[in-house]
């Protein structure tokens, strides 16, 4: 593709992402209107296979999170959690068990695409861990 890929081209804001993920947490309903069937939400937010953390529509927690050195997306995220961590620094996750959304927006590619400090320091996961730990107190 000559160095051009079909990812990292979708952009939004925290409010719109919160609306989308609330729709998903509500089983396809938002503001009293059923927009998607609950079965569709269940299909898209489930593990797609036994050998991968990927689902049909979203990433899922690693199945061995409890024993991983670097759990994904968070050591404390239950298996029902679904979301996506993006190239440009975004992390958007929904946890139906705790009725929780985690939306992290940054500009990882500033000042250049080679800036990978956010991943090297595991910032997104550490913040998500801190949120879960504060809820459990």
Protein language model annotation of sequence segments:
Residues 1-137:
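Catalytic loop of the DD-peptidase/beta-lactamase superfamily, centered on the K-T-G motif
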